Each structure stands twice: as C-alpha cells, then as structure tokens.
Amino acid sequence: MLVDSHCHLDRVSLKAYDKDFAAFMTATLASGVGHMLCVSIDLEHYPKMRALVDPYPQVSVSVGVHPNETNRQEPEPDELVALAADPRNVAIGETGLDYYRSEGDLAWQHQRFRHHIAAARACGKPLIIHTREARADTLRILREEGAREVGGVLHCFTEDWDMASQALDLGFHISFSGIITFPGADDLRQVAARVPLDRLL
C-alpha cells in the first residue's frame, strides 16, 4: 500500500475528472494509494478542506498555517489544539520558516512557528515542517520550543546534510519530493542516501 504523506486535496486540479472530486478519489484509491494526509495551509479554508475529505476514511488531516500565507488569521495555540482534537487529525502544520518567498521583517513567521510548536506539544501530535533558506533559525526555534517532544517531518527537504543530521538528532523524519530526480540535484540525492530508511519519507 502506498501512503501519500503530504497532499493538498482541496487544491488539486480536477480538469481530468470533469471537476468531480469523487471521481478523482476513486481513481486515486484504485491506483494503489491506500492512505493520504491532507495538509492544511490556513485556517480560513480548513473547514471546507475538512468537509471535502470527510467521506473518505482513507484521508487524515493536519491543521496549520503555512509560513508563506500572509494576511491570514494568525493561529493561537489553543485554537490549533481545539481543531487537532478531531479524531481524523494526526498532525500540526504545515508550519515553519520560508526566507525564499517572504521578505522584510519576518518576526511574524517566527511567532507563528512557535505557536504551532506549542500547540503540537500541548496535544502530543507531530509537526509538519516547511523550511526553505532558513536552516539556522528553523533548528534554533525547534530546539528552543522543545519540538523534540513531538517530532514530526521536515517535508519536501532541499537543504544540506548538516541540517538533515541535526533534524534527525531532534527526532524528526526527512521527506523528499520529486526534486531529487532533477538533473542538478546530485547533492540532494547524496543527502537522501544518508538518511536512515526508518526516518525517510
């Protein structure tokens, strides 16, 4: 059985399925994908996302606000914990830091990230981490906020082995995407080859 550990089912293109989500899900499940984790990127669309996947027990959800989502409702830890009480919820995120797409004073990203970690610790659920060009600050905040207690995954990892090894030491898993197949991704493939199989997604 295949498990898709990170998807956004509420944002998938349905052109090939005549805009029929049920047809898309039928085809996906028939292809051998047995379970999916539908990952939240903001709170405004979370109720709609949750309702969309409700008929499908093969889909779990997470709750969180992506670091690139600006002008969004800022999540308070208590609110995230309340939403995470849903039996179908298995994680907090996606959250983290992104210095590639965001500019200026990013203190708000740091605060948002800390709120997610606090929520994860409060409800005992793992974190889904998005990090891009923010290695030192991501690791520092994970340590400062005690993220080791809950662990989680660094999703769509594109950083170096030094960051991967430190994340592994903090109890996290490392997830790679199709980027590792790109011709110029030799360094990333070398990182993937060093991640223990039981910590690799």
Regions found by a protein language model. Name each.
Residues M1-L201:
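Mid-domain alpha/beta scaffold segments of enzyme catalytic cores
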